[in-house]
């Protein structure tokens, strides 16, 4: 891990560095160094370098593939960010986090993408766009914590969550601390649609989530 930190004061920089240190220890990732500047607006850039013998692409889905969600439903809204950031990680042990982080390598699905600030729907749009396919998601199949507004859950940062795509019935990730469910299908039609239990489809994301179309 390499980081570059800008902070208006040493106190703020120490808080940021402390958070990076705690996260690195929990995940078992060494911090090799970086750059720190005081007296500037707050900014943080982190670069992670790794190696794998079997990389799983973010754009490997094919038409007809199952789209699955693996998500840790444990936790609560991050204070001050209700409806936007779900915190499932700060109360997990390092062993739990490392086990979750190894799921994709063990399952080796055709495609995988961690659910980011774009939320479940937005991340599905990025996976579909990179794969030159579309996606139809079934909201009633999407695992969600009890009592959480479903619209918030579809669009928030959900802590640990991973979208995967694979041939039907293959590549399902399993974990005692996370739920995995098939939530949709990769389609020929670009973009992301929600297929509701009554059969109605609604457009949820356009085909150009990032504008970085393959080819």
Model-identified regions with their sequence ranges:
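Glycine-rich anion-binding loops of enzyme active sites
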Residues: 1-79, 185
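Active-site-proximal betaalpha loop/short-helix elements
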Residues: 8, 90-159
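Flexible, glycine/charged-enriched surface loops at secondary-structure junctions
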Residues: 28-35, 108-115, 134-140, 179-186
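Short cationic amphipathic helices and targeting signals
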Residues: 47, 158-169, 183
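Short, conserved charged micro-motifs
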Residues: 55, 168-175
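Short, compositionally biased
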Residues: 77-96
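A structural signal for short secondary-structure junctions
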Residues: 129, 154-158, 174-177, 186-188
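Acidic, Ser/Thr/Pro-rich beta/coil linker or hinge segments at domain junctions
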Residues: 176-215
């Amino acid at each position: 891990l390499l980081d570059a930190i800008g902070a208006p004061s040493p106190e703020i920089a120490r808080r940021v560095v402390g958070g990076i240190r705690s996260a690195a220890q929990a995940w078992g990732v060494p911090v090799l160094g970086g750059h720190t500047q005081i007296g500037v607006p707050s900014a943080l850039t982190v670069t992670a370098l790794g190696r794998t013998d079997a990389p799983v692409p973010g754009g490997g889905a094919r038409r007809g593939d199952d789209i699955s969600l693996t998500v840790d439903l444990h936790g609560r809204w991050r204070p001050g960010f209700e409806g936007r950031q779900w915190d499932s990680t700060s109360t997990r042990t390092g062993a739990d986090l490392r086990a979750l982080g190894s799921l994709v390598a063990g399952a080796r699905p055709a495609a995988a993408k961690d659910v980011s600030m774009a939320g479940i729907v937005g991340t599905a749009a990025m996976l579909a766009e990179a794969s030159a396919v579309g996606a139809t998601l079934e909201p009633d199949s999407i695992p969600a914590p009890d009592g959480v507004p479903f619209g918030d859950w579809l669009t928030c940062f959900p802590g640990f969550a991973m979208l995967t795509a694979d041939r039907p019935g293959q590549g399902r990730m399993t974990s005692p601390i996370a739920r995995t469910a098939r939530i949709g299908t990769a389609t020929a039609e670009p973009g992301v649609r929600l297929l509701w239990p009554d059969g109605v489809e609604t457009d949820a994301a356009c085909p150009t989530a990032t504008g970085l179309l393959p080819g």
